[in-house]
């Protein structure tokens, strides 16, 4: 049965080379499957799944996308993966995403979420093929005010715990890259670039 919801995208992603970091995670595996179904050539870059069974394994993603197992903290492996995939579009979802783990291993959280993102952004900057990049962070990037309404784009960055602080810092890093490198007047090639909170 054809998924009618995907029809609205037409051929936008057909035959596009797309690199997705964190494709073994829940959101990344769904995004990989969805883009594959839209005709994209998907390359995933991620650690091995950390649950058994994993969504990645249950949907057979390793059989339908190119998967490169790597830690985004290793810039050499990230750069090699970018050269292999030659992506036109990058979705960066890889992260240490657990607040509790951030208390137990704050350095790993900061190294992955900030340093790993810098490695991805540097690979985008060095690439001649990337036209667009999206970095996925979290609503935890905002200062926690405990109010009744949702956060807004112009709310201050913050974070009382290492995970939240790492996501706020990632937003600031992305803003610096957007302004310095990924615009028509910056020092690098024009790349359509955005962050989203999911």
Regions found by a protein language model. Give the residues of each.
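N-terminal Rossmann-like NAD(P)+-binding domain of SDR-like oxidoreductases, especially those catalyzing
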Residues: 1-197
């Amino acid at each position: 049965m054809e998924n009618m919801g995907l029809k609205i995208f037409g051929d936008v992603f057909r035959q596009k080379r797309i690199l997705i970091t964190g494709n073994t995670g829940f959101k990344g595996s769904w995004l990989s499957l969805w883009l594959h179904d839209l005709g994209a050539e998907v390359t995933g870059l991620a650690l091995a799944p950390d649950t058994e069974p994993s969504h990645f394994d249950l949907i057979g993603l390793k059989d339908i996308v190119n998967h490169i197992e790597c830690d985004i903290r290793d810039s050499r492996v990230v750069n090699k993966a970018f050269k292999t995939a030659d992506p036109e579009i990058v979705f960066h979802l890889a992260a240490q995403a657990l607040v509790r783990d951030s208390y137990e291993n704050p350095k790993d959280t900061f190294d992955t979420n900030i340093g790993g993102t810098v490695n991805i952004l540097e690979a985008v900057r060095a690439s001649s093929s990337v036209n667009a990049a999206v970095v996925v962070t979290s609503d935890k990037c905002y200062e926690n005010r405990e109010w009744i309404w949702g956060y807004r784009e112009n709310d201050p960055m913050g974070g009382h715990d290492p995970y939240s602080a790492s996501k706020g810092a990632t937003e600031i890093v992305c803003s610096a890259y957007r302004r310095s490198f990924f615009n028509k007047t910056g020092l690098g090639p024009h790349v359509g670039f955005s962050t989203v909170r999911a």
